[in-house]
Amino acid sequence: MDYIQHFSAGSKHVSKKSVAVDAEARKLVENAAVNYVTKHYKGIGYTVTSREKENVGWDLDAEKSGICLKLEVKGLAGNTISVRISQNEYKSMVNNKDCYRLCVVTNALCNPSLIIFVWDDEQSAWVSDIDQSIKISIEEKPSYLAVVE
């Protein structure tokens, strides 16, 4: 939180230090989320492989009994679900609906909770795997914004 001191109220200038701290904080949240999702899927018998550095449109492969899931992991520091999806991730979601999972970890750094969104053909929407009344809308922009409706 030290970076807050470097931002002047009313100023539109954000110091390089605050940007660096924000990037570091985002990386911590993302790493915690990836670790949480990996642990979750391993706990239910999947073999999990990182694809993060390959730029394939998802972060992890999860394989079990001939099933291969493509897991895109989004970590959030709080519990409001609103995540950025890159064009590459969105293209992968659309092209792999049957095996793609959008795994959102809220409160990733303390008391994490996992919500997994899967494609539902009947609703033509991405819905929570445990409560299909929870669905996300995806707003197209240079990157995509997915928000719980």
Question: What label would you give each PLM region?
Answer:
Residues 41, 60-62, 68-75:
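Conserved catalytic cores of phosphodiester-cleaving nucleases, focusing on short active-site segments
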Residues 105-149:
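Domain-level recognition of nuclease-like catalytic cores that cleave nucleotide substrates
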